[in-house]
Amino acid sequence: MKLILREDVENLGKGGELVDVKPGYGRNFLLPRGLAVLANPKNVRELEHQKAIATAKAAKMKASAQAVAKRLAETPITLSRKVGEQDKLYGSVTAMDVAEALAARGLQIDRRAIDLAEPIKTTGDFEVPVKLHSEVVGKVKVKVEAEAA
């Protein structure tokens, strides 16, 4: 019996997959619980249509992320902080600080997307990776300098 899964089913497949199961399993378990629908021509066409829409949407999201990554590379940010001995900062520069600086430049990036391994605690130039998409990682140049006294 051929069925199209509506949801992920353990040891069988993921939602949207076309699977072949024994008739009893399909009739008595999957269909009554709404976990699958019959794989008739109409449902198969609808599945293919949904997959095409999802593929187009994913490509659009990736292209958008690549455009943002290009803009990030062209937008260096400079942060001024109070400095103590040996160019060590009082406090640190965190992902939240980088996100706020980018927002001031017109780029709304979620702070959780900024992949700062540990807060910046010294002055200097840094390249901070930003996860924009599962396949796209942008980099923003961050310059931390001493605040004028």
Curated annotation (Swiss-Prot):
One Pfam match: Ribosomal_L9_C
Domain of life where this protein originates: Bacteria
Keyword Ribonucleoprotein annotated: yes
GO cellular component entries: ribonucleoprotein complex; ribosome
Leader peptide range in chain numbering: none
GO-annotated molecular function: rRNA binding; structural constituent of ribosome
InterPro entries in the cross-refs: Ribosomal_bL9, Ribosomal_bL9/RNase_H1_N, Ribosomal_bL9_bac/chp, Ribosomal_bL9_C, Ribosomal_bL9_C_sf, Ribosomal_bL9_N, Ribosomal_bL9_N_sf
Keywords: Ribonucleoprotein, Ribosomal protein, RNA-binding, rRNA-binding
Keyword Ribosomal protein: yes
A single BP term in Gene Ontology: translation
PANTHER family found in the cross-reference section: 50S RIBOSOMAL PROTEIN L9
Family: Belongs to the bacterial ribosomal protein bL9 family.
Function: Binds to the 23S rRNA.
Protein name: Large ribosomal subunit protein bL9
